[in-house]
Amino acid sequence: MKQRIALLGSTGSIGIQTLDIVRENPGLFEITTLTAHRNWERLARQAVEFDADSVVIADERRYDALRQALDDTSIKVYAGEEALRQVVQSGQVDVVVNALVGYAGLMPTIAAVEAGKKVALANKETLVAGGCYVMPLAARHKAPIVPIDSEHSAIFQCLTGEKSPVRRLIVTCSGGAFRDRSREELAHVTVEQALKHPQWRMGDKITIDSATLVNKGFEVIEAHWLFGTPAERISVLLHPQ
């Protein structure tokens, strides 16, 4: 049976990668709902291609443009945070893929967990801001939370099936755009330089957070909540490759 997916943040880099996987595996997955913050044009194109049941645009000012773009379809169009909460709790959804950016991802995760949905989580701020609440809530509702961002997904896969306790977790780190800069050089770097990641093409926020290493701090916190490992047993390894 196909897994019915609500994809939050479908127009961002992780959302687009998720749709690539769905496109390549039509027998395994189907899209029921797509959401975006304000990129209504891409959202409309995606909704038509994947024959989504509904779409949500978080920025209510874009609602009219999105509704008009989908006027000739049967796709239901919603806007705002409350609509986001309602679609993730729909009985037509099996898996919620949370690819939202920032704190905006927290409340949809909570709503999905309360409905007992499986959450494929790429939004690290959910656990950075609310891990102490979200993880016990997920356990209470028997709602699996599966990390899909690179480092935590790798750790999750390594630990699956293992019965011995975890002694230590190592989170890898590319080092970002400034990994070879001295402290003195860092005083004069620009936004444009920070956005030139040496390895990956990502959204602006995650690229900046990578350059400042704030992202890696978030990932240590995320690993703590996901795997129940104390922070003192989580280390970071610079691995430019």
PLM regions: where:
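Glycine-rich nucleotide/cofactor/substrate-binding loop typically near the N-terminus or early
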Residues: 32-88
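Rossmann-fold NAD(P)-binding glycine/threonine-rich loop
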Residues: 66, 103-115, 124-143
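Beta-loop-alpha module in the N-terminal Rossmann-like domain of NAD(P)-dependent dehydrogenases
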Residues: 79-111
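Rossmann-fold dehydrogenase core element
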Residues: 134-152, 167-169
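Substrate-binding/catalytic subdomain of NAD(P)-dependent oxidoreductase enzymes
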Residues: 208-241
